[in-house]
């Protein structure tokens, strides 16, 4: 691997030189560079350059908004708007206001401008609540692109247009995109494109090697833990658990963080199984009380598998807290304990509903269901794993479930319930938001209820977009992690309608091929194929 790192350094040096030159000489071309770098999933190499390019473009964009819109192509207005907003630079949506009064002219002028329409459609996904002009622009682009597709079904860009309409960039992880859109960029024949392509290939090789080693370590950790021997009924899915941190911690250097985060994620899944299927209400109450006390005493009445699960939870959490204390000088144990208590209380509430046959009101279900996703537990752990200074003030914000964590959890809960309803996978035992909503609104059809849930998910994404633009105390790296978690949801829950899943499956299969040897590899193959349908 030494040679590949040497080669990476040489190519990286050349690309950085080209990038820095573009920032100074051609700000618009630097936007294409930023866009391509992000699509290729290599932005972790260019954080300073990307920020410098965006700062310069933000100054140009903000100082001459109307002139900029009038004197540039549609794609040259929409692309900087999207890139700036997704990095937290607020840009007024007024730049698209002229579409309201000139829709006929816009249709005539841009009906065949695929690049411009796609750029604008992608930009409208960064809207926040109340930005009607962006909503209108997005709807108009959607119409025009669909019309273009009907006229050009055999065009070499037709597949790309269809993919964009189904899965816009903002909601996807670049790593799992089969993205032909890069070819639309203006510099595709230049030396900088060749360098970027080479750098992306090198990066993919390094990431694949790193991930394979991590899967080996996760697999060994889980086997040595022995929990699967005692808790035989639990879903044995170390690959599925690992996929979340693998997708959200995108920098290859965060190897330790990905492995550490897999551990609490595994417990969220296992404890969820215990509460859903394998524990009586009395046992689950004792189990939850033990978590609240954070001690193993007075648990004699619990079955052995619950006792062992409690012990593993204590050990993993205390070990995690000790590592964070050594690294940051801050002990997060109280925050971690509170996150687990919240989760267990939510699980227990659902167990009470199931035991009594009670179907709660939709708002009550959703408020509890947001917590029972386990998102807060996972994101709290991820917060402490990152490389930034930690203080009591920021910890208090994370501890109190800020909007960005709430939104990610709500998107996951609603997406899970929506996919279950569409595929008829819900077993009806613990209900879903759609069940509760239709029980409240007897005149609503299942299709209308599903459209309502899809609308709620869309609104929550707008709140997430607002959080990107909000100047709060949360580090940008944590914000990006939360966004990646939300982007991972469609891959994990919308598998029947998401072509990106095939890329995810292939990636997991490739990793498992090299990470696990001999007879065990066959088991992992089965697991990696099963995790997407459970």
From Swiss-Prot:
Subcellular location, principal: plastid
Keywords: Chloroplast, Hydrolase, Magnesium, Metal-binding, Plant defense, Plastid
Reaction catalyzed: neryl diphosphate + H2O = nerol + diphosphate
Residues given in the record as Mg(2+) 2 binding sites: 272, 276
Molecular function terms from GO: hydrolase activity; magnesium ion binding; terpene synthase activity
InterPro entries: Isoprenoid_synthase_dom_sf, Terpene_cyclase-like_1_C, Terpene_synth_N, Terpene_synth_N_sf, Terpene_synthase-like, Terpene_synthase_metal-bd, Terpenoid_cyclase/PrenylTrfase
Motif mapping: DDXXD motif: 272-276
Highest taxon listed in the record's lineage: Eukaryota
Induction field: Induced by salicylic acid (SA), wounding, and after feeding by cotton leafworm (Spodoptera litura) larvae.
Pathway: Secondary metabolite biosynthesis; terpenoid biosynthesis
GO CC terms of this entry: chloroplast
Binding site for Mg(2+) 1: 272, 276
Annotated residues for binding of Mg(2+) 3: 416, 424
Cofactor field: Mg(2+)
UniProt subcellular location: Plastid, Chloroplast
Biological process, per Gene Ontology: defense response; terpenoid biosynthetic process
Enzyme Commission number(s) of this protein: 3.1.7.13
Keyword field contains Magnesium: yes
Keyword hit for Plastid: yes
Cofactor binding description: Binds 3 Mg(2+) ions per subunit.
Function: Monoterpene synthase that catalyzes the hydrolysis of neryl diphosphate (NPP) to form nerol and diphosphate. Is specific for NPP and has no hydrolase activity toward geranyl diphosphate (GPP) or farnesyl diphosphate (FPP). The monoterpene nerol may have an insect repellent effect for the plant leaves.
Domain notes: The Asp-Asp-Xaa-Xaa-Asp/Glu (DDXXD/E) motif is important for the catalytic activity, presumably through binding to Mg(2+).
Family, as annotated: Belongs to the terpene synthase family.
More details: The growth and development of cotton leafworm was retarded when feeding on NES-overexpressing tobacco leaves.
Identification of the protein by name: Neryl diphosphate diphosphatase, chloroplastic
Source organism (scientific name): Glycine max (Soybean)
